[in-house]
A protein has these predicted regions:
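TRNA-recognition modules of translation machinery and tRNA-sensing kinases, especially anticodon-binding
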Residues: 1-142, 147
Length: 148
């Protein structure tokens, strides 16, 4: 019988590595909350059109790097290659921008169909902060640990 292995470029996160991820995520949550960012969560699967519109129909991400497939009903769906487009769609769709300014944080797996190599996988974790509705951009640099 043929051995079943994980797909090329995907990750298994074993207990020791999971503890490191937990530490980094807890630090991210703590720091982002202290700066007024609220955590949000949005789907891993999104309408393909969202990414075509946000990153550009002719971009390498859209043309070469997205995991895209059709549902049984024929709708084109994509596993999120990045988080900004999904977070913006969610904020608009759910009225988070109605009050004017909004700071959000999110984390989770992202997927890009690119050649796996050292330090680059097809599945990767992204931690992000987004600030919407601010007239003047003021940057607060948050330093997060990169090694646990």
């Amino acid at each position: 019988m043929k051995k079943i292995s994980k797909l090329r470029g995907m990750q298994d996160i074993e207990p020791l590595q999971a503890k490191k991820y937990d530490f980094i995520e807890m630090e991210f949550n703590s720091i982002s909350k202290s700066y007024g960012y609220d955590e949000v969560r949005f789907p891993i699967l999104e309408n393909t059109e969202l990414f075509k519109r946000s990153v550009g129909d002719e971009s390498d991400i859209v043309n070469k790097e997205m995991f895209t497939f059709e549902s049984k009903s024929g709708k084109s769906m994509t596993m999120r290659p990045e988080g900004t487009a999904g977070s913006m769609r969610m904020a608009i769709e759910n009225g988070l921008l109605d009050s004017g300014q909004q700071r959000i944080s999110y984390k989770g797996p992202m997927f890009r169909y690119e050649r796996p190599q050292k330090g680059r996988s097809r599945q990767f974790q992204q931690l992000s902060l987004e600030a919407y509705g601010f007239n003047a951009v003021s940057y607060t640099h948050l330093t997060l640990p990169t090694k646990a």
